[in-house]
From Swiss-Prot:
Signal peptide: none annotated. One of its GO terms (cellular component) is nucleus. Its main location: nucleus. Gene3D superfamilies: AP2/ERF domain, DNA-binding pseudobarrel domain. Residues 61-116, 183-289 bind DNA. The keyword Transcription applies. This is AP2/ERF and B3 domain-containing transcription factor ARF14.
């Protein structure tokens, strides 16, 4: 995780994000193919947000919006007296709408917002289906509307998954299975521990995830990599090079992946790439015991085969127990 980030992505609760200042130019964002965003950072691979000093800049007419020295607008919300940064936007009303989205997720339908409540049940369902940290992440990366629209396209008028969505899910799984295996890595205790980062073997990193050149042919210090899992969920990881340890690492976003997949030391992570023009990246995982956690759809509980897709609650509860026992057993040994 980035050194200056104070939102724990592996939790549904949100910590404060302190104001950060820098005299360096604002970060530049580039697109590389369909699955990569590159960030030219000002320092140490950290995206820098600058909060305006109220005594120097005029205040906004909107709640939760603060002006920035570069003419843009920042959005923020407070929870338990701690500030949560929601990102920087070109227009003042964009920042205000970002605040409204966060307010609905943090405080419910009765939250005080800048604009008249136009949140429909479908959007409420979308908000409730994601953790606070996930919504904050979408707002910061300006992907909230896109992901909400995608959710709407995948539902029919009755709120059920469309046939097109079911077919798309089959395509995702097929693409995952036929993708080219780039490399695998057995995760170490530090990879799944409190350091919140995954070290990528240097030769694999330079071969498959080379950092592009920025100004003066100097490699940029970090970029965002997108990976799809077998279920079609997109995981965004910050990928950078640490001079201190001379290693390539996945940081921001990794801790959430570890928690959701309940990874333990000794588990196997695989990285794949599609063979089509999109060149999408995929990520898979298997337990140390050899159980394929990517495709397991049925488990046997008390002598009965239970569909994990149909009984989500049983799936989540059982996986938590199994993962907890699996990790504890490794520690004892």
């Amino acid at each position: 995780m980035d050194a200056m980030s104070s939102v724990d992505e592996s939790s549904t609760t949100t910590d404060s994000i302190p104001a950060r200042k820098s005299s360096s130019p604002a970060s530049l964002l580039y697109r590389m193919g369909s699955g990569t965003s590159v960030v030219l950072d000002s320092e140490n691979g950290v995206e820098v947000e600058v909060e305006a000093e109220s005594r120097k800049l005029p205040s906004s007419r909107f709640k939760g919006v603060v002006p920035q020295p570069n003419g843009r607008w920042g959005a923020q919300i407070y929870e338990k007296h701690q500030r949560v940064w929601l990102g920087t936007f070109n227009e003042e009303d964009e920042a205000a709408r970002a605040y409204d989205v966060a307010a609905h997720r943090f405080r419910g339908r009765d939250a005080v917002t800048n604009f008249k409540d136009t949140t429909f049940e479908e959007e409420v369902e979308f908000l409730n289906a994601h953790s606070k940290s996930e919504i904050v992440d979408m707002l910061r990366k300006h992907t909230y509307k896109e992901e909400l629209d995608q959710r709407k396209r995948n539902r029919d008028g009755n709120g059920k998954e469309t046939t097109a969505f079911a077919l798309a899910s089959m395509v995702v799984m097929t693409g995952f299975k036929t993708a080219e295996l780039l490399f695998e890595k057995t995760v170490t205790p530090s990879d799944v521990g409190k350091l919140n980062r995954l070290v990528i073997p240097k030769h694999q990193a330079e071969k498959h995830f080379p950092l592009p050149l920025g100004n003066n042919n100097v490699s940029v210090k970090g970029m965002l990599l997108n990976f799809e899992d077998v279920n079609g969920k997109v995981w965004r990881f910050r990928y950078s090079y640490w001079n201190s340890s001379q290693s390539y690492v996945l940081t921001k976003g990794w801790s959430r992946f570890v928690k959701e997949k309940r990874l333990c030391a000794g588990d196997l992570i695989s990285f794949k790439r599609s063979n089509d023009q999109d060149q999408k990246f995929f990520i898979g995982w298997k337990s140390k015991s050899g159980l394929d956690l990517e495709t397991g759809r049925v488990m046997r509980l008390f002598g009965v085969d239970i569909s994990l897709n149909a009984v989500v609650v049983v799936k989540e509860t059982t996986e938590v127990l199994m993962s907890s026992l699996r990790c504890k057993k490794q520690r004892v040994l």
